[in-house]
């Protein structure tokens, strides 16, 4: 499947994990910088090396103890535990200047128990003897990779090794059907909704939060249409780590969203709409995914509570007026069947096609009804439009002075396209391109070339008449 591998960076504080994270992600901003209610010492980013994509996690929370005593729990936070168990590959960053200390040895022992690929990176080798990394052979995790992450030295070699067995993006086999992701905070009813959508008990449901693990793909048919449900529900029973209740799996949520065509976010009506719900909605929109909102456990509310939630929906969802919101009860099945039409409309909207002629006509109608403003005495001209992509749909508009088009006018055009094509549930990207003169960088413009051609004809004609009029000697 096309789910991205996960690489977790672990190690003591100040060994260079964040610097290596920035090198991997090319200093891009972390995908999730601060999700409400989550430990803030983890960052998540997208990385690509030679067309091989993966998610990189910068973990925190490993202690400074250097006496080598105590259990691994003394050194590692619950969130770091979670990141390590979700990862496909572990990069263990150590400090070549400081040398190996007790905490490094304790973490190394723990990593031996995981059965996952582990790469030891001896960072900060600049200014130390070439033999300094050799000390970390004692960890028993293979050859240490010398690196100076702050200068980028050694990063390329590590990436080449890390990605050697990862699939190329163009070689990934996609499952057949509309890919539907079910996301939401813990215990909002995701697994119950999955069972309702599938119409059978395909997923075990638990009442306590934190019983979710890896995303799984469930292909199924409904009304003759193919679907692939990307579900983050399952059972955690994989050793000591699983005795801890996981608060939230950011990695699996990001993977499910990115790999979906349509995302359904489940919100607990009893808890109301919280910031974490909005963060997940925001990420789905940033990823360009079509969206449907399901307010679950609706039947358990009083009339006053329902009125309050409706007011909250109007207030907190005002930035997504094009997204359909459903009130459902996954447990009893109320309203669940109504999700499918919204899911299909959102998907169709995200993949819509239209001819350039038709799109340009809609553009011209919008411009006629409400012309663009003038800039420096010249009116901005928008000449034609065409489709530039899908999921999310992209409309490309060509014209002059497009860089000066106000945001308010850009939103006006987006709303016009939404209304005409009845786009529901999907972000819409409207991109503006400046018309370029193809002869701008050439010595001859069409006008100049035409002039020279006419002059040459005149010279030829004059020469012809001169020759004709000459008398023979």
From Swiss-Prot:
CDD domains, alphabetized: EngA1 (cd01894), EngA2 (cd01895)
Ranges where the EngA-type G domain occurs: 5-170, 178-351
Region ranges (Disordered): 438-473
PROSITE patterns, per database record: G_ENGA
Keyword field: GTP-binding, Nucleotide-binding, Repeat, Ribosome biogenesis
Comp. bias regions, Basic and acidic residues: 455-473
Polar residues bias spans: 438-454
Molecular function GO terms recorded: GTP binding; ribosome binding
Binding site for GTP 1: 11-18, 58-62, 123-126
Pfam families for the chain: KH_dom-like, MMR_HSR1
Amino acids binding GTP 2: 184-191, 231-235, 296-299
UniProt keyword GTP-binding, yes or no: yes
The KH-like domain, residue ranges: 352-436
GO biological process entries: ribosome biogenesis
Spans through the membrane: none
Superkingdom in the source lineage: Bacteria
Complex and partners: Associates with the 50S ribosomal subunit.
HAMAP family per UniProt: GTPase_Der (MF_00195)
Alphabetical list of PANTHER family matching this protein: GTPASE DER
Similarity comment: Belongs to the TRAFAC class TrmE-Era-EngA-EngB-Septin-like GTPase superfamily. EngA (Der) GTPase family.
Function in brief: GTPase that plays an essential role in the late steps of ribosome biogenesis.
Protein name, UniProt field: GTPase Der
Lineage: Bacteria, Pseudomonadati, Pseudomonadota, Gammaproteobacteria, Moraxellales
């Amino acid at each position: 499947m096309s789910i991205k591998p996960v690489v977790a960076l672990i190690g003591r504080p100040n060994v260079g994990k964040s610097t290596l994270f920035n090198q991997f992600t090319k200093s891009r901003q972390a995908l999730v910088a601060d999700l409400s209610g989550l430990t803030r010492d983890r960052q998540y980013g997208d990385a690509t090396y030679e067309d091989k994509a993966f998610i990189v996690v910068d973990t925190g929370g490993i202690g400074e103890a250097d006496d080598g005593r105590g259990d691994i729990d003394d050194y590692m936070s619950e969130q770091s535990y979670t990141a390590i168990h979700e990862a496909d590959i572990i990069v263990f960053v150590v400090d070549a200047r400081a040398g190996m200390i007790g905490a490094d040895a304790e973490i190394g022992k723990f990593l031996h128990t995981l059965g996952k690929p582990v790469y030891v990176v001896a960072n900060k080798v600049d200014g130390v003897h070439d033999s300094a990394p050799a000390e970390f052979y004692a960890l028993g995790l293979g050859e240490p990779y010398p690196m100076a992450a702050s200068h980028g030295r050694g990063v390329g070699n590590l990436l080449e090794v890390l990605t050697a067995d990862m699939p190329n993006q163009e070689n990934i086999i996609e499952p057949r059907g509309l890919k539907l992701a079910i996301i939401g905070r813990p215990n909002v009813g995701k697994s119950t909704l999955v069972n309702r959508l599938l119409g059978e008990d395909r997923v075990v449901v638990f009442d306590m939060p934190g019983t979710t693990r890896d995303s799984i793909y469930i292909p199924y048919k409904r009304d003759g249409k193919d679907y692939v449900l990307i579900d983050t529900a399952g059972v955690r029973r994989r050793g000591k780590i699983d005795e801890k209740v996981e608060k939230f799996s950011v990695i699996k949520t990001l993977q499910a969203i990115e790999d979906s065509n349509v995302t359904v976010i489940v919100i607990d009506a009893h808890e109301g709409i919280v910031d974490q719900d909005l963060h997940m909605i925001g990420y789905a929109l940033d990823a360009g995914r079509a969206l449907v909102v399901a307010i679950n456990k609706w039947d358990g509310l009083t009339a006053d509570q329902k009125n309050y939630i409706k007011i909250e929906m109007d207030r907190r969802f005002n930035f997504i007026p094009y997204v359909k919101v459903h009130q459902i009860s996954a447990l009893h099945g109320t309203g669940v069947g109504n999700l499918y039409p919204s899911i299909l409309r959102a998907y169709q909207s995200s993949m819509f096609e239209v001819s350039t002629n038709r799109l340009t006509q809609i553009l011209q109608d919008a411009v006629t009804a409400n012309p663009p403003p003038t800039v420096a005495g010249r009116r901005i001209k928008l000449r034609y439009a065409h489709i530039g992509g899908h999921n999310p749909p992209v409309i490309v508009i060509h014209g002059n002075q497009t860089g000066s088009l106000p945001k308010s006018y850009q939103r006006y055009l987006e709303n016009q396209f939404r209304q005409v094509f009845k786009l529901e549930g999907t972000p819409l990207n409207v991109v503006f391109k400046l018309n370029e003169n193809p002869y701008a960088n050439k010595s001859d413009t069409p006008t100049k070339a035409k002039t020279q051609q006419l002059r040459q004809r005149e010279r030829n004609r004059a020469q012809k008449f001169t020759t004709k009029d000459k008398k023979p000697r």
